[in-house]
């Protein structure tokens, strides 16, 4: 279980994990921390009485850690894993190898994903932009795998790229085994500190992600051989409506991970990542 907070000018985030579990879309809590070269909070961290076993609060622009609790403990991240998936997607968009209007075809493997999903059918096509919304708003495991395969050919190759990116970011206590966080394998883990690193990288390099992560509800259209029908995406991050200034980022939950969240919110003078 992880709680992570991110901060940046005019932005604040908060997250917490409890002892409950769920295989469906749920609120989640996650953590984040900065590299050794970044400014950190004083050694004496006050006890805030938080139930979450791992927590980190960061000011996003400077990377200053404002609060942390067991931020270096390895834990199962659940769907917070998708933050790295989104980071790689936006890097492809930046390079021009991917366009928001490109169509992505859902494979049988992507279609077979359980847990939180948007119920894509095998052979169904959706634009990259719609897939991004499905991932960050509804936490769609099927959409995550479809995008991974579209970019790298196979999910396993995409996961290799995720782990390479983690190394580049100094996420030394992180290892990914899938692109969506559905697995509860002991070999799939991260820390609040590492979640903070990848979350900060995503929102600082690609602030447009917040235009998607702040969506509360939006309708997409499934178009398959069965016909066309609407489907409503609802944000799994309830902080979007329950915490003033919250604009993201990603929740996650499995029976092992419990509830996790990496949250981003705006403050009067700073934005924070939790």
What residues fall within each predicted segment?
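Generic "edge-of-domain/loop-turn" microfeature
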Residues: 6-7, 62, 111, 270
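Active-site-adjacent loops and short helices of periplasmic peptidoglycan-processing enzymes
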Residues: 15-193, 203-204
């Amino acid at each position: 279980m992880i709680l992570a907070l991110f901060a940046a000018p005019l932005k604040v985030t908060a997250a917490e994990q409890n002892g409950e579990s769920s295989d469906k879309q749920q609120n989640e809590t996650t953590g984040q921390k900065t590299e050794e070269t970044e400014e950190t909070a004083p050694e004496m961290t006050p006890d805030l009485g938080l139930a979450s076993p791992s927590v980190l609060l960061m000011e996003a622009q400077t990377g200053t850690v404002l609060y942390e609790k067991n931020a270096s403990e390895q834990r199962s991240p659940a769907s917070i894993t998708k933050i790295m998936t989104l980071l790689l997607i936006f890097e492809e968009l930046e390079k021009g190898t991917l366009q928001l209007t490109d169509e992505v075809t859902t494979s049988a493997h992507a279609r077979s994903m359980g847990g939180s999903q948007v119920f894509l059918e095998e052979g169904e096509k959706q634009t990259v932009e719609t897939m991004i919304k499905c991932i960050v708003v509804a936490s769609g495991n099927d959409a995550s795998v479809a995008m991974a395969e579209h970019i790298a050919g196979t999910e396993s190759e995409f996961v290799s790229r995720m782990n390479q990116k983690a190394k580049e970011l100094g996420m030394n206590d992180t290892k990914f085994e899938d692109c969506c966080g559905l697995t509860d394998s002991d070999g799939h883990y991260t820390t609040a500190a590492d979640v903070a690193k990848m979350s900060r990288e995503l929102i600082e390099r690609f602030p447009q992600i917040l235009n998607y992560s702040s969506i509360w509800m939006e309708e997409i259209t499934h178009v398959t051989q069965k016909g066309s029908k609407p489907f409503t995406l609802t944000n799994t991050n309830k902080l979007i409506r329950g915490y003033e200034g919250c604009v993201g980022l990603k929740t996650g939950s499995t029976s092992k991970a419990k509830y996790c969240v990496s949250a981003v919110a705006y403050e009067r003078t700073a934005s924070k990542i939790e």
